[in-house]
Swiss-Prot record:
Record's keyword terms, sorted: Cell outer membrane, Cytolysis, Hemolysis, Ion transport, Membrane, Porin, Protein transport, Signal, Transmembrane, Transmembrane beta strand, Transport
Family classification: Belongs to the TPS (TC 1.B.20) family.
Notes concerning its domains: Probably a beta-barrel protein.
Record PANTHER family: OUTER MEMBRANE TRANSPORTER CDIB, SLR1661 PROTEIN
Organism of derivation: Serratia marcescens
Listed name of the protein: Hemolysin transporter protein ShlB
Alphabetical list of InterPro entries matching this protein: Hemolysn_activator_HlyB_C (IPR005565), Polypept-transport_assoc_ShlB (IPR013686), POTRA (IPR034746), ShlB_POTRA (IPR035251), TPS (IPR027282), TPS_OM_transporter (IPR051544)
Signal peptide: 1-18
KW Membrane (keyword) present: yes
Sequence ranges assigned to domain POTRA in this UniProt record: 79-152
Any one GO MF annotation of this record: protein transmembrane transporter activity
Length: 557
């Protein structure tokens, strides 16, 4: 009896394999596409949450130093001094001091002394030491007039609470020189929480040169919940999705932040679905921001074959730790470095058979440098990063192929220019976004660039183009109209991109798309509509995509 059952099982399996063999590559591509989309969507959500509200202080009015009063009454009359000496200068280098104007050798006037004190004060302000003060000291035995600098320090920081944790936002600053950029950094960290509107006052302290930093915060409710629906899904798993996002500010009283995103398809969930969840936690510490994130997604769809229906399903897991460090900032730019370690596990199945080629396990180490620049009419930001696959946590060379190695190296470049344009009497917003990636190594499919994804070249609902190397450029022109409590923002978009797949010798492939749409905001409600069309430019045999209509509705509680 056992032999008969075994023979029957082998017969059915052989028949199924024979029928589905011609579609094996299609199944691999479909499963890989679902996994890639899920991982890249969760990565995009994490990056947007981390970047959101990070640089508020650059956009607000900065703390300014009061103009220094003249050290001496203005006069061109010669003073009875032989020269000038400085004392109390510890925060300026000899190279900084060499930029000061020289004094006349024969006749030093009050005007010369006042010019020197202004230049010296300006040097301190340019370095961010806005409380430095210069005082006159009586001449020494050599007849040299003294300029004594009180450089200024933070005597005390007060006004913190569970929403604005001064120990983590301004760590170790008490007793140290008062530097404007360090205060701006702490304000940025405080204001990255949507419930905070934090400002500070610099007040005189009790000690000579001391200042008291008093924090003032207007606090709103610490939580937000956003619910919505859209038709951004895929045909195979369902177009319409329900989405929900919940955020909570300072859950542990550490000026920390936690966010949970969830989405699920709505159509026929018993037979096809796509569900995804992303959790993010971040903690500030001065110029550092530490983050941890996790995401999980699963999908299932059924493919109709000539004589039966087969099930394609799978899941992805992603866990990561990240650290961001702002190493330089001034009144109109911020430069930062970040390091990230990410673990990815992908499991795709055709019926009960695991698709090994499209089910890699990856451990990635990433280093990146970011630059943000405030321009007269806009903002420019750029990020350059390098990812390296590591042989950790079960990641290694794929057992079924010598060409699929998890220890690859990939470079990425992201740049965004957002600027205001005056056309006649109207003000428009032009946004140009560029993304490119390159690797000399063959990449696992989940690391490819999806050119026809909604976040790349807009306008595709059926065709797919993806590959190891490539780039795309998104261009969007918009204008906002304020109608009382309602804001209407229509837009036009034009995108182009190219990819170079390594799995064949077809060379570069190109795509382009155009779009038009509008966003309507009324209080906490949002409605967005978009009509787009995409074209595959490098393969005329590819069926043309139809006009795509996308809709999104959301409400924030």
């Amino acid at each position: 009896m056992i032999k008969k059952i075994t023979a029957l099982t082998l017969l059915v399996s052989t028949a199924l394999s024979a029928e589905t063999l011609p579609d094996s590559h299609m199944m691999q591509d479909m499963s890989m596409g679902e996994s890639r989309r899920a991982l890249q969507d969760s990565t995009r959500e994490v990056n947007q949450l981390i970047e959101q509200r990070r640089y508020q202080q650059l956009k607000q009015q900065r703390l300014l130093a009061e103009p220094a009063a003249p050290a001496l009454p203005q006069s061109a009359q010669c003073l009875p001094i032989a020269g000038v000496y400085l004392q109390g200068v510890t925060l300026l280098s000899p190279a900084d001091l060499s930029a000061l104007s020289g004094l006349p050798e024969q006749c030093i006037s009050s005007n010369d002394i006042n010019r020197l004190t202004r230049e010296l004060t300006r040097l301190y302000v340019q370095k961010g030491y806005i409380t430095a003060r210069v005082q006159i000291v009586r001449p020494n035995s050599q007849g040299e007039l003294g300029l004594s600098v009180t450089e200024g320090f933070i005597e005390k920081i007060e006004g913190g609470d569970r929403w604005v944790n001064s120990r983590l936002l301004f760590p170790g600053l008490e007793g140290k020189p008062l530097k404007l950029t360090e205060l701006d950094q702490g304000l940025d960290q405080a204001n990255r929480l949507q419930s905070n509107t934090t400002k500070l006052d610099i007040l005189p302290g009790r000690q000579v040169g001391g200042s008291v930093i008093r924090l003032r915060n207007q606090h709103a409710k610490p939580w937000l919940i956003t619910a919505g629906t859209d038709n951004y899904g895929q045909k195979s798993t369902g177009r319409w999705l329900a989405r929900a996002t919940a955020t909570l500010d300072s859950p542990f009283g550490l000026s920390d932040f936690v966010s949970l995103n969830a989405n699920s398809t709505l159509e026929n969930p018993a037979h096809r679905y796509n569900r995804a969840y992303t959790l993010l936690y971040s903690l500030p510490y001065g110029a550092f921001t530490f983050s941890g994130f996790a995401s999980f997604s699963s999908y299932e769809n059924h493919q109709q074959l000539p004589h039966n229906v087969v099930k394609l399903h799978g899941q992805t897991q992603q866990y990561g730790l990240r650290s961001d460090y702002v190493f330089y900032r001034d009144h109109d730019q911020i430069d930062s470095l970040s390091g990230q370690l990410t673990y990815k596990r992908i499991d795709n199945y055709f019926e009960s058979v695991r698709l090994e080629v499209s089910s890699p396990t990856l451990t990635l180490a990433e280093l990146s440098a970011s630059h943000l620049q405030i321009l007269p009419n806009g903002v420019f930001s750029a990020n350059l990063s390098v990812e390296q696959g590591m042989p950790w946590l079960g990641a290694g060379r794929h057992p079924s192929s010598v060409h699929l190695d998890s220890q690859f190296t990939k470079g990425k470049l992201f740049a965004n220019l957002s600027q205001r344009l005056r056309l006649g009497d109207a003000t428009y917003q032009l946004n140009n976004l560029f993304y490119g990636q390159y690797s000399r190594d063959p990449l696992p499919g989940v690391e490819w660039l999806s050119l026809t994804d909604r976040s790349a070249v807009r306008g595709f609902s059926r065709s797919t183009q993806s590959g190891d190397n490539g780039w795309y450029l998104q261009n969007t022109l918009s204008r906002s109209f304020n109608l009382g409590a309602t804001t209407l923002t229509p837009r036009l978009g034009a995108d182009v991109g190219r990819i170079l797949p390594r799995q064949d010798n077809s060379g570069w492939r190109s795509s382009a798309g155009i779009s038009t749409g509008a966003t309507l905001r009324y209080q906490r409600a949002l409605v967005d509509l978009e009509v787009s069309r995409g074209w595959i430019l490098s393969n005329h045999a590819t069926p043309e995509d139809p006009v795509q209509v996308l809709a999104r509705f959301s409400y924030t509680f």
